[in-house]
Amino acid sequence: PGRAFFHSRQGGGHKEKKKKRSSIISRIILIICACVFVFAAVRLVSILLEYKKGNDIYDNIEGNVLDDTPVNITIGEDNQDVTIPFVYNHQALLDINPDGLGFLYVPSVDIRLPIAQTTDNDFYLTHTFDKTYNRNGCLFVDYRIKDGLNASHVIIYGHNMGSGAMFGTLARYKNSGFYQTEGNDVFYIYTEDVIREYKIFTVYITDPISDTFTFNFSNLSGLREYAKNVQAESLYNTGVDISNATQVVTFSTCTDDSKQRVIVSGTYVGESKLDNGTSSEASASASE
């Protein structure tokens, strides 16, 4: 009986120790999970605050560069009358940042953003137009492109932000129905003294390194061959004639998984001269 009593005591103590160890392990796991949750929450809040800061910066830039006064212009292939909902001030853009080349307006997705160019393709990946460090970055032209926004092929890079900022809404163009909605096939670029209209002729997905990123063509035949090739890559037939293309502007942004690039390209179709922020005469696209 004494031996049996002794063994019984030993078994009970062993179970209590096991329970205590299990309880300690559970607490440690709980603490680790809580720490991970807190870290993730802090990280998320930090990212959201940075998004907000970036959006606020661009709202301020827009307020300084654009005057919300509608302007009627005559522009495009058929010299159509178009109403632009603002007046652009190029000098105000340069006062913020001399790297500024112009201003992009895409009515279909309400993109209103400045375009910069500097001596590399890295700086504006992590800095806004006013050179503030921010993950929104800035739209920028490839530094190797000569003549900036006047080049025969202009490539403009921008982040695909989850918030929809920058080029975060370009993916809508993968849907042919969106493209075919009236007015969604054009975008505008302001330079120092003109507003130019472009018609989107191709939308496709490509690799980060591909023939898409070819520029500094020596003649128009090279540009037109390029335009023909990238139009063949389009996710759908836009029906746009690019046989007489004189300039192509390409938007490039990451896919959601960052492994590929969404490409939206437009061909120049006309421009309207600016006079103190208002338009005067228009000219149609040159053709040969």
Question: Where are the regions a protein language model picked out?
Answer:
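N-terminal targeting leaders characterized by basic, low-complexity, disordered sequences
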Residues: 1-15
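Intrinsically disordered, low-complexity segments
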Residues: 6, 20, 281-285
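N-terminal Sec-pathway targeting helices
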Residues: 17-34
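Solvent-exposed, non-transmembrane regions of membrane-associated and secreted proteins
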Residues: 37-288
